[in-house]
Amino acid sequence: MYLQLKSKLENVLSYFFRKMSQGYDNYDDMYDQNGASPAPSQNEKPGKSGPGFVGIKFCPECNNMLYPREDKESRVLMYSCRNCEHREVAANPCIYVNKLVHEIDELTQIVGDIIHDPTLPKTEEHQCPVCGKSKAVFFQAQTKKAEEEMRLYYVCASQDCQHRWTE
């Protein structure tokens, strides 16, 4: 029972933080006229730790959950209790982190015509190891491990090949 309640609370909080990051001014604005809110989507996973998890704050007076709100006069993020009117200024202005991590293969698949992208530089000094053509598009990116250095990635400019490699 406890795990079910915890999971449900995490889903609700995930939805809440996502809506707050989308520009809703307060918790009440997230609901429709009938008081219902859409359920979080199935592919949303509530964060338990790491950079995507911001945390839950509780009221020091009544132990209820504190909700993020904006103080419209001073334009400061506040946490406020709905039960006892306790308010405190947020130490961290971040209420939600959405970190996107993609592999290089995924990045080149997202932009299907990467070889025709006019914003990317082209080179004729690096020969494709698959087809032997000497024209390639290149870009710099970082792998999943943030501690690694940026690497230079090449994509063969041949329409038939489009092989991806790094040196």
UniProtKB/Swiss-Prot annotation:
<dbReference type="GO" id="GO:0008270">
    <property type="term" value="F:zinc ion binding"/>
</dbReference>
<dbReference type="GO" id="GO:0001193">
    <property type="term" value="P:maintenance of transcriptional fidelity during transcription elongation by RNA polymerase II"/>
</dbReference>
<feature type="binding site">
    <location>
        <position position="84"/>
    </location>
    <ligand>
        <name>Zn(2+) 1</name>
    </ligand>
</feature>
<feature type="binding site">
    <location>
        <position position="128"/>
    </location>
    <ligand>
        <name>Zn(2+) 2</name>
    </ligand>
</feature>
<dbReference type="Pfam" id="PF01096">
    <property type="entry name" value="Zn_ribbon_TFIIS"/>
</dbReference>
<dbReference type="InterPro" id="IPR001529">
    <property type="entry name" value="Zn_ribbon_RPB9"/>
</dbReference>
<feature type="binding site">
    <location>
        <position position="131"/>
    </location>
    <ligand>
        <name>Zn(2+) 2</name>
    </ligand>
</feature>
<dbReference type="GO" id="GO:0005730">
    <property type="term" value="C:nucleolus"/>
</dbReference>
<dbReference type="GO" id="GO:0003676">
    <property type="term" value="F:nucleic acid binding"/>
</dbReference>
<feature type="compositionally biased region" description="Polar residues">
    <location>
        <begin position="34"/>
        <end position="44"/>
    </location>
</feature>
<keyword id="KW-0240">DNA-directed RNA polymerase</keyword>
<feature type="binding site">
    <location>
        <position position="81"/>
    </location>
    <ligand>
        <name>Zn(2+) 1</name>
    </ligand>
</feature>
<feature type="binding site">
    <location>
        <position position="62"/>
    </location>
    <ligand>
        <name>Zn(2+) 1</name>
    </ligand>
</feature>
<keyword id="KW-0804">Transcription</keyword>
<keyword id="KW-0539">Nucleus</keyword>
<feature type="binding site">
    <location>
        <position position="156"/>
    </location>
    <ligand>
        <name>Zn(2+) 2</name>
    </ligand>
</feature>
<keyword id="KW-0862">Zinc</keyword>
<dbReference type="GO" id="GO:0005665">
    <property type="term" value="C:RNA polymerase II, core complex"/>
</dbReference>
<keyword id="KW-0863">Zinc-finger</keyword>
<dbReference type="InterPro" id="IPR001222">
    <property type="entry name" value="Znf_TFIIS"/>
</dbReference>
<keyword id="KW-0479">Metal-binding</keyword>
<dbReference type="GO" id="GO:0006367">
    <property type="term" value="P:transcription initiation at RNA polymerase II promoter"/>
</dbReference>
<dbReference type="GO" id="GO:0003899">
    <property type="term" value="F:DNA-directed RNA polymerase activity"/>
</dbReference>
<keyword id="KW-0943">RNA-mediated gene silencing</keyword>
<dbReference type="Pfam" id="PF02150">
    <property type="entry name" value="Zn_ribbon_RPB9"/>
</dbReference>
<dbReference type="InterPro" id="IPR019761">
    <property type="entry name" value="DNA-dir_RNA_pol-M_15_CS"/>
</dbReference>
<dbReference type="InterPro" id="IPR034012">
    <property type="entry name" value="Zn_ribbon_RPB9_C"/>
</dbReference>
<comment type="function">
    <text>DNA-dependent RNA polymerase catalyzes the transcription of DNA into RNA using the four ribonucleoside triphosphates as substrates. Component of RNA polymerase II which synthesizes mRNA precursors and many functional non-coding RNAs. Pol II is the central component of the basal RNA polymerase II transcription machinery. It is composed of mobile elements that move relative to each other. RPB9 is part of the upper jaw surrounding the central large cleft and thought to grab the incoming DNA template.</text>
</comment>
<comment type="subunit">
    <text>Component of the RNA polymerase II (Pol II) complex consisting of 12 subunits.</text>
</comment>
<dbReference type="GO" id="GO:0031047">
    <property type="term" value="P:regulatory ncRNA-mediated gene silencing"/>
</dbReference>
<feature type="binding site">
    <location>
        <position position="59"/>
    </location>
    <ligand>
        <name>Zn(2+) 1</name>
    </ligand>
</feature>
<dbReference type="GO" id="GO:0006283">
    <property type="term" value="P:transcription-coupled nucleotide-excision repair"/>
</dbReference>
<feature type="region of interest" description="Disordered">
    <location>
        <begin position="28"/>
        <end position="49"/>
    </location>
</feature>
<feature type="zinc finger region" description="TFIIS-type">
    <location>
        <begin position="124"/>
        <end position="166"/>
    </location>
</feature>
<protein>
    <recommendedName>
        <fullName>DNA-directed RNA polymerase II subunit rpb-9</fullName>
    </recommendedName>
</protein>
<feature type="zinc finger region" description="C4-type">
    <location>
        <begin position="59"/>
        <end position="84"/>
    </location>
</feature>
<comment type="similarity">
    <text>Belongs to the archaeal RpoM/eukaryotic RPA12/RPB9/RPC11 RNA polymerase family.</text>
</comment>
<feature type="binding site">
    <location>
        <position position="161"/>
    </location>
    <ligand>
        <name>Zn(2+) 2</name>
    </ligand>
</feature>
<dbReference type="InterPro" id="IPR012164">
    <property type="entry name" value="Rpa12/Rpb9/Rpc10/TFS"/>
</dbReference>
